[in-house]
Amino acid sequence: MPKILIVEDSPDNMRLFRTLLTMRGHDVVGLAGGDGLLETLERDRPELVLMDIQLPGKDGFTLLAEIRASDHRGLAVLALTAHAMSGDRERALAAGFDGYITKPIDIRAFPVQVERALAGERPAR
C-alpha cells in the first residue's frame, strides 16, 4: 500500500489520521513539525503528504515551497487546516497544494479524499 507522510503538530489529530489510514492498509509516517521534512521525504519516499498549514516555526506554505524547490517537487501534498476562512482553499491551491482538507475532518470523507489524491485526482484551480 502507498506510504503517506503526515505533518501535523497536534498529537490527537496525528493519532486520528494515522488510525484512519492504517485501517485502510496504508503505511503512515508522522512528523510533528517541519523540522527534518526534506530528510524524511528522502528517507521514507512517501507517495502523498498531508500537511497542516498552521505549524510552529515554518508554516505549511513555506514547507510546500521547500518541497516544490526540491527533488520531490512532483509529490502530491494536501493542505490540512482548522482555520477555514473564505479564500483559504483558493490560496492553498494557488500556492501549489494538490488539495485542501478542513479540520475537524469528516471521518467518512477523509479516507476518500486521500484515495482520490493517491489516484492523481486534483481539484479545479
Each predicted region: which residue ranges?
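Short amphipathic alpha-helix used as the core "switch/output" element in two-component signaling
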Residues: 39, 61-73
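Active-site residues of response regulator receiver
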Residues: 52, 81
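The feature encodes the CheY-like receiver
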Residues: 56, 70, 85
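Short hydrophobic/Thr-rich beta-strand motif most characteristic of the beta2 strand and flanking loop
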Residues: 25-34, 39-40
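Two-component/phosphorelay signaling modules centered on CheY-like receiver
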Residues: 11-29
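Conserved acidic carboxylate
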Residues: 8
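Acidic catalytic/metal-coordinating carboxylates
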Residues: 12, 33, 59-62
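C-terminal output helix
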Residues: 15, 105-114
